[in-house]
């Protein structure tokens, strides 16, 4: 029984992995967490050689949730993108089993009237991969008809709905520059806890205050524990506005779930941050 946890990136100036050479920071990160969001691919399709280096730094059981490029999802809105999709799939092929899911993050303007285009797009994708869809239009969280419409479209290809839980961020006014920036950029939508598949994916955003972040994820401990008991295999990504503590918090989240589900396989101990010496 495994719960995979990770962060929005594999390096940050405040993390121990930042002390490693740039070419080996992913390997160092994989000693702390066993999943990562592939956000860099949103901005451009990586070279195949770059992806080969990612695969070479991680075990086959490591999970990449790789975001489709914005030219596909945001600029062309899933239309006329065959060549872009083919290029992206070719580039990420070296990940093999590490490509846990391909993540289709859609803009806030993507509304219930666009679901038919999404359904067509999903049906045309190869079944080689799992797919995970993130939406931000409030109708998908507040209108039963819109929720059912999207769930049916995802269900036809066994795709997962990725909730981005930002409720803790918006519970009180921001207190740092990073929180103020997040207030202007992050979606403000209700929390969603329904899994559609055996491989749910959760994105949780806390605050820069550690205890507030921990208090805010308590409902997820209960939900994840129940999913594990049902035989599901979840992946959870922990965010904070500045992400300075996200690496440690991701491991702590795993520990809290393991307290609720003692049979959960523990994460390996992270590598030492300083060389071991006798004196």
Identify the function of each model-found stretch:
Residues 1-279:
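Residues lining hydrophobic/aromatic ligand-binding pockets adjacent to catalytic sites
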């Amino acid at each position: 029984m495994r719960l995979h946890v990770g962060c929005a990136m594999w390096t940050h100036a405040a993390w121990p992995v930042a002390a490693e050479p740039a070419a080996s920071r992913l390997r160092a990160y994989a000693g702390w967490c066993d999943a990562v969001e592939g956000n860099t691919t949103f901005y451009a399709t990586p070279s195949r050689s770059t992806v080969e280096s990612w695969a070479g730094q991680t075990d086959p059981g490591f999970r990449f949730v790789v975001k489709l490029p914005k030219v596909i999802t945001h600029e062309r809105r899933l239309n006329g993108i065959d060549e872009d999709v083919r290029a992206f799939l070719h580039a990420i092929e070296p990940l093999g089993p590490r490509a846990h899911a391909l993540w289709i993050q859609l803009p806030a303007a993507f509304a219930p009237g666009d679901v038919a285009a999404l359904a067509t797009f999903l049906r045309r994708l190869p079944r080689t991969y799992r797919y995970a869809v993130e939406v931000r239009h409030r109708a998908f969280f507040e209108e039963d008809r819109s929720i059912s419409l999207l769930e049916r479209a995802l269900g036809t290809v066994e795709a997962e709905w990725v909730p981005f839980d930002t409720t803790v961020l918006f519970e009180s006014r921001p207190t740092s520059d990073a929180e103020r920036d997040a207030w202007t950029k992050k979606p403000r939508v209700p929390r969603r806890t329904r899994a559609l598949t055996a491989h749910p994916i959760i994105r949780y955003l806390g605050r820069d205050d550690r205890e507030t972040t921990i208090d805010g994820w308590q409902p997820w401990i209960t939900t994840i524990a129940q999913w594990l008991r049902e035989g599901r295999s979840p992946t959870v990504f922990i965010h904070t506005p500045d992400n300075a503590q996200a690496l440690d918090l991701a491991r702590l989240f795993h520990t809290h779930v393991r307290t609720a589900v003692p049979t959960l396989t523990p994460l390996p101990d992270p590598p030492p941050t300083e060389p071991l010496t006798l004196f």
